[in-house]
Amino acid sequence: MAGEEGEDEAASIELQLEHHLQEQRASLTAVDEALAADPSNADLLEVHEELLAAIKDAEEGLLHLKRSRLVKQIDEIFPNQEPTSEAPEVAVDPPDDVEPEPLEPQEFSVGSKCRFRHKDGRWYNGCVIGLEGSSDARISFLTPTSENMSMCKFFLQQRCRFGSNCRLSHGIVIPILSLKQFTPTRWQQSLVGSSILAASGHHSGLWRRAELESWDDDLKVGQVVFQDDGSSARLPSDSLSISEYADESDEDGEGSSSDEGSDFSEDGDQEDESVHQGLGLLESKNLSGVQTETAIFAKWEHHTRGVASKMMAKMGYREGMGLGVSGQGMLDPIPVKVLPPKQSLDHAVAASEVNDSVGPGKKRSRGGKRKREKKFAEQARAAKAEEEERSVFSFINSQLVGQDVAEGSAVKSKKDSSGEANGHAKKEDRRSLLAYDDEVKELRSRVEKLEEMMKRNRKDKAFYEAASKKLKQTRKALADAEATHASATNAVARKEKEKKWLKF
């Protein structure tokens, strides 16, 4: 009876696999048609690859079931013959083209490592924590990187009270037939400098991103530097992983992607060595990870891991050479001109235009006899024209202008005398108003900063007193600057008003 039930179960599993295989092939046909219309769609390409992998897995499982059924039938027909004689008859495909047979359920024991495919379509490394009947196994993530991937220790002790609402993982039930053999990573010197995953005990068993700084082949121990906090640790090989995901290939460990990565790393190291020959690094190979000594062309090169030095070396630069096609260095220095404070760039442009107009070989004209004669002649012609056009209105205008000029000169002399008495003999105009405005703004911002500084350092008595004293001085300077700005504003307004009256 038990044998018949086992046969019925195997037949039902075989039918389910065939049904899934047909559905996946139909989906693959639909995806192929969509790709024919849009061959550059990245999502469709990814789905196409996942469907191919799923079809391959289903075909392998179906092949294994059919092979097992045929072997049982042959054993029933020929019970007296040894199974080795029928082995060549059962083999369907050449051994080179067939994946190693999936392990029998009894070969996956509790605690053994394996590879399994998650519901997100990716392959992960896992560990068998329990068997669910004869066909399923409960798997935990071997390299958990998040809390929902970490195994719940209370569930392992059968004491978890949250059930399906637990924020930790209770394992994943996977059919044993879909499990694959675990492929360990071959750690070697060529992987130094690569980004890996490392386990740390003080982070709830989670694996963190790190960089392999060095590797000891004798002790099988690696020095890693964690990327999140910069801490370093010396960990064995079983606490290191080259990636969060497992290798999808069906080859042995010697031909896995770790070897491909090592070959790539070796090529990269050879290229780096050829580059480092012109840089003079002390340890070109051992320092390919977290570098502490580089060919320092500048002080910032220590913090950039020598990236700029490598780029310059690839372009043919050698230490001590000058830049340029023939290494001549900089020929024409960049002109530097210090501008006066609190003036716009228009001042610099005007000054440069004046210098260009004068020319390098000419002297600036300071006037002369001919210019003075020309100026006097123009004034004489203007006076003569006014006398010829003399009328009642011109007489009234001349009288008004004369009175206003006299009053303006009197006011100006009075203001100059009062300004000299107050120490403000400076001419007030719109430009001086801008200077006063900038000074007031600067003092106000300084007062705000000092007030914030005093609020932050109330507990520090010495610092608080010094800041308070500085704040009083700054406020006094601000009050003086505001008063000066107000007086200058009034003076400019009065001057503009006088100009309007003079024009009238």
From Swiss-Prot:
UniProt region (Disordered), positions on chain: 77-105, 230-276, 351-390, 406-432, 482-504
What GO annotations for molecular function exist for this entry? DNA binding; zinc ion binding
Q: Where is the composition biased (Basic and acidic residues)?
A: 375-390, 413-432, 493-504
Composition-biased stretches, type Basic residues, lie in 361-374
Q: Origin, by domain of life?
A: Eukaryota
Q: One Pfam family name from the record?
A: G-patch
Task: Tell me which UniProt keywords the record has, alphabetically.
Answer: Coiled coil, DNA-binding, Metal-binding, Zinc, Zinc-finger
Q: Where is the composition biased (Acidic residues)?
A: 94-104, 245-254, 260-272
Q: Which Gene3D superfamilies match?
A: 2.30.30.1190
Q: Which residues cross the membrane?
A: none
Any coiled-coil ranges, and where? 40-69, 430-500
Q: Which residues form the G-patch domain?
A: 304-350
Zinc finger (C3H1-type) residue numbers: 146-173
For this entry, the protein name equals Zinc finger CCCH domain-containing protein 18
Source organism: Oryza sativa subsp. japonica (Rice)
